[in-house]
Amino acid sequence: FAPWLKEQGFEVEISNSLDSYLDLEKLKKVDVIIQVYTQGTITAEQERNLLEAVKGGVGLAGWHGGLADSFRSNTEYQFMVGGQWVAHPGGIIDYEVNVLPEKKNDPIVQGLKDFKMHSEQYYLHVDPGIEVLATTTFSGEYAPWIEGVVMPVVWKKYYGQGRVFYCSLGHVAADFNVPEAREIVKRGILWAAQASDK
């Protein structure tokens, strides 16, 4: 999404280290943090700065495990994100993503219809306070005890003054070849960055 962000007028900085979170003053000046970091650890100072920046109004956006399976031991981080990955029954499977009819006018999903995916169908533990925009329903084929469970796929929320956007799609970059998936993430990033408000 970096080239697209540049086209939108954002100055983009890419970092391969969580040490980017050590400079709190710099963090506080960005519009949005897009984190892609899975199954790792974060130091107390890195986490404290990230939480403070978002709480103070910096946007946070991400997808798949890069945001919802980053730091399994950090519950305040999970509270900020709004959920934590726990399983993807069946691995790579075919499933449908359903845009909630009552959210059809939300700018992140407006004009989009339900769509098919061939990827991991995330089962998450989610905060009941999130604003769900799209869901998926588990068939029960790979875990019979969850047949019919409706799971959030796309949500937004606030953490302090910061906007947080999450999408569970995106196991591989090719998942974003699905136009609806790509559009949802683009719009979600802009919402988190408050770009439409400026």
Feature-to-residue mapping (PLM):
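Extracytoplasmic/secreted proteins, especially bacterial periplasmic and envelope-associated proteins
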Residues: K29, E45, N49, E76, ...
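Structural detector of well-ordered beta-strand residues that form the stable sheet scaffold
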Residues: G59-A61, L133, F165
